[in-house]
Amino acid sequence: MVSLTTSEVHPTMGVKTFSAGISACLADIITFPLDTAKVRLQIQGEGQTSSTIRYKGVLGTITTLAKTEGWPKLYSGLPAGIQRQISFASLRIGLYDTVQEYFSSGKETPPTLGNRISAGLMTGGVAVFIGQPTEVVKVRLQAQSHLHGIKPRYTGTYNAYRIIATTESFSTLWKGTTPNLMRNVIINRTELVTYDLMKGALVNNQILADDVPCHLLSALVAGFCTTFLASPADVVKTRFINSLPGQYPSVPSCAMTMLTKEGPTAFFKGFVPSFLRLASWNVIMFVCFEQLKKELMKSRQTMDCTT
């Protein structure tokens, strides 16, 4: 009997989910300062966040934060970010192939674009609902400032969960689910599908082998396309999640307030750090994801051969 090679053995759902979660956590740790800079730029210009400190550009925001609030502030909210990736990315990315195969109904032909989009929408929707509380806590910890003697709303991750649930309501932990769902519908539909299509085009046309350079280029292209399309929903999501009770009656109200007071460019605030963060996050996550899947399947094959 001829055994399958490692490249021919498809990773199990468990391997994909585990690999996605670990890879996403690693990517988040490395790129978190960019995410914090993005949040600060996105909320800049709001009434409640107006201050004498103005952030300019990616490096300017990072250095200003480090000088005025200390380097640790760049990683404020990281525990919630890690929790988010464990509950969110592991499902959104890890289950993508499995759901895609389900929509393909076991056909031997490659999945259609519709199958890929449907898989991205389903995994993204489930992941947003499960991971939304971690998103709320992460954004609020990143947004709060310790300047001018202002007492912070929250002293830490678990304190934030408790304060939000007890002083606002338990349902507030799911605040901003609608714009976050919109954002992740765009991200999943663009990021995973673009990465999938780009990787397939490079490999099938024998431009690049299915290895690190191919994964790197595919991730960069997916990152740019995703950032451009998802930026408006991302800014509205951040503003709405970070808002005080009653500040914005609804998500459309938040969007209209931004448009009338700050203009259409407000929807692209923080675009550069958002792209740098998402592109670098994509590169780290997808490259680690692909390599980790391969190594885990190699280990599994080795164990199967010895038993």
UniProtKB/Swiss-Prot annotation:
The chain crosses the membrane at residues 11-32, 74-96, 117-133, 179-195, 213-232, 267-289. The keyword Mitochondrion applies. GO terms for biological process: adaptive thermogenesis; cellular response to fatty acid; cellular response to hormone stimulus; cellular response to reactive oxygen species; mitochondrial transmembrane transport; proton transmembrane transport; regulation of reactive oxygen species biosynthetic process; response to nutrient levels. It catalyses: H(+)(in) = H(+)(out). Solcar repeats lie at residues 11-102, 111-201, 210-295. GO terms for molecular function: cardiolipin binding; long-chain fatty acid binding; oxidative phosphorylation uncoupler activity; purine ribonucleotide binding. Fatty acid 16:0 binds at K56, K269. Its main location: mitochondrion. The keyword Repeat applies. It comes from the Eukaryota. It is found in: Mitochondrion inner membrane. Has no constitutive proton transporter activity and has to be activated by long-chain fatty acids/LCFAs. Inhibited by purine nucleotides. Both purine nucleotides and LCFAs bind the cytosolic side of the transporter and directly compete to activate or inhibit it. Activated by noradrenaline and reactive oxygen species. Despite lacking canonical translational encoding for selenocysteine, a small pool of the protein has been observed to selectively incorporate selenocysteine at 'Cys-254'. InterPro entries: Mit_carrier, Mito_Metabolite_Transporter, Mitochondrial_sb/sol_carrier, Mt_carrier_dom_sf. GO terms for cellular component: mitochondrial inner membrane. It is a multi-pass membrane protein. Residues 1-10, 97-116, 196-212, 290-307 are mitochondrial intermembrane. May undergo sulfenylation upon cold exposure. May increase the sensitivity of UCP1 thermogenic function to the activation by noradrenaline probably through structural effects. Residues 33-73, 134-178, 233-266 are mitochondrial matrix. Most probably functions as a monomer. Binds one purine nucleotide per monomer. However, has also been suggested to function as a homodimer or a homotetramer. Tightly associates with cardiolipin in the mitochondrion inner membrane; may stabilize and regulate its activity. This is Mitochondrial brown fat uncoupling protein 1. The gene is UCP1.
